[in-house]
């Protein structure tokens, strides 16, 4: 799964004939410059505008879940198995079997997942698009995807590319004798590339992403630009297994794998297939995105020999790890520990390792010539499993207990290819395993009767008469629901994990105030549930959201508007035992502009972190804008700070934030006392009127955000503001409710 990082791809050049496009280079130079080019510090709002729904050719009514559930999955699997051993002349299969190639494809599709922001992973099928389709580490996976095209063409919309890319690797393992624990569909296709921060480097295979302590900058997971994980020859090409182990532990940890899962994945994945380095990388042409149009999406055209088969160049490393490259075995671990390994170089010049014992030189069959034999190989990153004391202990245990190893690899593989899918409720198909795993963030099923409209009205009354303030109720509901990440579908209000470790202690959540609110809501919950004789219940997860809704309805009524905030019961309460504390720590908000909270450890500015938060919540620019304006007047800042509370009537839902922000009666200056704070003075009297953060003022300073702010500040926008705020609020409250579709509110003034 690891690919080399020597200057293999440095010789790539544009393969378009100048006689066909004589002014191509000139046209590139004359390409219009973006606003970001002219003003690099301008706040980038593009994350809130992707993906663009108009890019999807399937249309708004397309329901992928319905299509997938109508698919004959067994027929697809049989077609995949047949494909595995049907070698094509245009890209011959190693050992007559494409299985190892498909495993690598699946691994590299899913393995981009990272825990700190939930981005990456197989969902969307982004391996088809730039930059992933042209990463050095994904060399020749363009052929793997093209091999799958007849199957995708046959089954069409019933199976997405995203699902097919993963299913192919799973079936490959099964067809080669390994028993997986299942497969879940449900990954919808993306239709355009999206901008993701993959690192600061300006060149492929560079590594300039470490902080002063040598650790990867967050949220990155890979150690090198253009690689999935680490340099297989060792950090910076230095063949040091112990140093490689440190990098492996860091990067695999950032893709949600512990030490045992890491060893299982490497040892299991390298039980199959081989690496390819028949010659130097100088023979390779450009990656797909830079290749000539006549290549039709293919890249890395190889001018060495036949350019394929025995002459294939991918990573520059060359050889197989085991004597059974197309059959599941435990030979990888046997070889790792049974031999002493000596450093050598592949025909392509990459550093790798072979057994010291010359008797091992004919153990491994050749991929194409049955008369040839080879020695097994190991990479520096493989030897990390032997020499790192923690990895070695695990690997030896797996060697001595093959069944335990099989189970560990099956579980780690399933986690790898499903980690970015979110809760089990999103899983589709007949191959979904019945076992519930803690990394799936499970919640209990609804095994009771849900509350009806009369109950909801009664409960709202009790909440509003409990002594809890509008601010407290809104903040608690927001803190619970806004943990949701639309990248990997984690977090959200379902489960009421805000009452559990670690969320109950997060500084952004005002732990002392939160404990008071939860205690009051739990009392209301218990009194209601104990009074029911028909099995009806309200969960705390539902009650937290209902409390926020009730507070907003009251705040709108005080502004002169009657509105019902849509509420859909059905959330349940998770237990601490269902919650992996360490796993949830990465969801902690280090900044939340909606609550005017910012931890100075961030390496991005407060406005940038606001956009990041809104992006994770899948909000649009107007939704982000209206929510900030509403949260400010509802006095919902962390710590009850008054920054941006531009109203003399806090707790009442109105458009005062925008009206007062845009008023020319105020002159803004940087605070001379507090860094990052701004003070607004009355232009006539010089009296201090407001204090604000850069998150507040960005809605007046950024031209695009100001345009939206103006739309909510007009005299005729008061009802629209409330309507839009409630709709955006409901979107956040129901973001993790994959079982429903959010409803819009209706307003009466």
Curated annotation (Swiss-Prot):
It comes from Legionella pneumophila (strain Corby). The record marks 104 as: Transition state stabilizer. It holds the Pfam family peroxidase. SUPFAM superfamilies: Heme-dependent peroxidases. It catalyses: H2O2 + AH2 = A + 2 H2O; 2 H2O2 = O2 + 2 H2O. One of its GO terms (molecular function) is heme binding. The gene is katG2. Heme b binds at residue 270. Keywords: Heme, Hydrogen peroxide, Iron, Metal-binding, Oxidoreductase, Peroxidase, Signal. The active site is at 108 (proton acceptor). Residues 1-27 form the signal peptide. InterPro entries: Catalase_peroxidase (IPR000763), Haem_peroxidase (IPR002016), Haem_peroxidase_sf (IPR010255), Peroxidases_AS (IPR019794), Peroxidases_heam-ligand_BS (IPR019793). PROSITE patterns: PEROXIDASE_1 (PS00435), PEROXIDASE_2 (PS00436), PEROXIDASE_4 (PS50873). One of its GO terms (biological process) is hydrogen peroxide catabolic process. This is Catalase-peroxidase 2.
């Amino acid at each position: 799964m690891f690919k080399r990082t020597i200057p293999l791809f440095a010789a790539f050049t544009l393969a378009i004939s100048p006689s066909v496009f004589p002014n191509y280079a000139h046209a590139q130079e004359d390409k219009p410059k973006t606003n970001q080019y002219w003003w690099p510090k301008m706040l980038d709002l593009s994350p809130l505008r992707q993906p663009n729904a108009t890019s999807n050719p399937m249309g708004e009514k397309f329901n992928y879940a319905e299509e997938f559930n109508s698919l004959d999955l067994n027929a697809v699997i049989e077609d995949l198995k047949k494909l595995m051993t049907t070698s094509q002349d245009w890209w011959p299969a190693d050992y007559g079997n494409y299985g190892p190639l498909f495993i690598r494809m699946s691994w590299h599709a899913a393995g981009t997942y990272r825990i700190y922001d939930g981005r990456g992973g197989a969902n969307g099928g982004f391996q088809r698009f730039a930059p992933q389709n042209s990463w050095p580490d994904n060399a020749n996976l363009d052929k793997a995807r093209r091999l799958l095209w007849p199957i995708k063409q046959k089954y069409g919309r019933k199976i997405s590319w995203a699902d097919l890319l993963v299913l192919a690797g799973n079936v490959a393992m099964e067809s080669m004798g390994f028993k997986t624990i299942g497969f879940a569909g449900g990954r919808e296709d993306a239709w355009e590339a999206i901008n993701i921060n993959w690192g600061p480097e300006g060149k492929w295979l560079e590594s300039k992403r470490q902080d002063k302590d040598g650790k990867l900058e967050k949220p990155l997971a890979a150690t090198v630009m253009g690689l999935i994980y680490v340099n297989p020859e060792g950090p910076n090409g230095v063949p040091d297994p112990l140093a490689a182990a440190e990098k492996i532990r860091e990067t695999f940890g950032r893709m949600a794998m512990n030490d045992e899962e890491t060893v299982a994945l490497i040892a299991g994945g390298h039980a199959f297939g081989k690496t390819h380095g028949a010659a130097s990388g100088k023979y390779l042409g450009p990656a797909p995105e830079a290749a000539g149009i006549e290549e039709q999406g293919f890249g890395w055209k190889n001018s060495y020999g036949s350019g394929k088969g025995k002459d294939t160049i991918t990573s520059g490393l060359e050889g197989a790890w085991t004597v059974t490259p197309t059959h599941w075995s435990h030979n990888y671990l046997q070889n790792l520990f049974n031999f002493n390994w000596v450093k050598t170089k592949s025909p392509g010049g990459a550093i790798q390792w072979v057994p010291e014992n010359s008797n091992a030189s004919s153990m491994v069959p050749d991929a194409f010539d049955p008369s040839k034999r080879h020695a097994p190989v190991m990479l520096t990153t493989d030897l990390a499993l032997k020499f790192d004391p923690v990895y070695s202990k695990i690997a030896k245990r797996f060697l001595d207990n093959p069944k335990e190893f099989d189970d560990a690899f099956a579980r780690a593989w399933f986690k790898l290819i499903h980690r970015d899918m979110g809760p089990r409720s999103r899983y589709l198909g007949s191959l979904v395993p019945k076992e519930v795993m803690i990394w799936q963030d499970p919640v209990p099923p609804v095994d009771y009767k849900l509350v009806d409209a009369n109950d909801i009205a009664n409960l709202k009354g009790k909440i509003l008469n409990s002594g809890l303030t509008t601010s407290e109720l809104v903040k608690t509901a927001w803190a619970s629901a806004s943990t949701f990440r639309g990248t990997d579908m984690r977090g959200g209000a379902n489960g009421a994990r805000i009452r559990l470790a670690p969320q109950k202690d997060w500084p952004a959540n005002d732990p002392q105030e939160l404990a008071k609110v939860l205690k009051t809501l739990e009392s209301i919950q218990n009194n209601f549930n104990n009074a029911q004789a028909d099995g009806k219940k309200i969960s705390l997860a539902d009650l937290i959201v209902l409390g926020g809704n009730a507070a907003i309805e009251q705040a709108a009524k005080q502004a002169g508007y009657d509105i019902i905030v849509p509420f859909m019961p059905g959330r349940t309460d998770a237990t601490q035992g269902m919650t992996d504390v360490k796993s949830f720590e990465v969801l902690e908000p280090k900044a939340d502009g909606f609550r005017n909270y910012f931890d100075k450890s961030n390496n991005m500015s407060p406005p940038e972190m606001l956009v990041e938060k809104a992006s994770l919540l899948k909000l649009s620019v107007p939704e982000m804008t209206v929510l900030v304006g509403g949260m400010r007047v509802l006095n919902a800042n962390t710590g009850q700070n008054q920054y941006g509370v531009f109203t003399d009537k806090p707790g009442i839902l109105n458009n005062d934030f925008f009206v007062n922000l845009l008023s020319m009666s105020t002159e803004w200056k940087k605070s001379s006392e507090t860094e990052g704070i701004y003070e607004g003075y009355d232009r006539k009297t010089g009296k201090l009127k407001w204090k604000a953060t850069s998150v507040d003022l960005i809605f007046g300073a950024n031209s695009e955000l100001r345009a939206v702010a103006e739309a909510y500040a007009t005299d005729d926008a008061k009802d629209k503001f409330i309507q839009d705020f409630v709709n955006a609020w409901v979107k956040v409250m129901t973001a993790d409710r994959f079982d429903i579709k959010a409803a819009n509110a209706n307003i009466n003034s």
